[in-house]
Amino acid sequence: MQEITIERTQHPKQKPTDQTRLGFGNYYTDHMFLMNYDEGKGWHDPRIVPYGPIELDPAAMCLHYGQEVFEGLKAYRTEDGRILLFRPDRNMARLNSSNERLCIPAIDEAFAVEAIKKLVSVDQDWIPTAEGTSLYIRPFIFATEAQVAFTRHRSCFLPSSFPRLAPIIRKGSTQ
């Protein structure tokens, strides 16, 4: 299994103090997981880095053909403070199922789960503790090859980021 390098942020963000007003996708953690794919090398260079913009060639296939897949899963705290992920193995299996449909190279599902666990560990202070809240994890993969003509993917990118999440349906709601 590949080693995941970690570069910790030198400028931590301020965490929201009112966990009842988090909303969906309004806050992002300090770090993100990245990994590249190149034909011949496979998936390589797994790393956790400070959250920030991703550079992308304007001719990247994901921009012209929508060659992108994503999954969503949650990390949450139990009453005794443990951190749990909700069925990450199934999420990674679904991600690979989507990859297959779009001819995106498969990921090692077990490695992807371990990478997410490591990222959750690095940013564990971002996991909200209020009832019904969680840390939403969004692994996604997109084709990065600069090619306007449609072809099989030779290069892809796997980032994962964490928007904080309040309950989507509030307790007592009729929706």
Question: Model-found features: residue ranges?
Answer:
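Conserved alpha/beta cores of soluble small-molecule-handling proteins
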Residues: 1-175
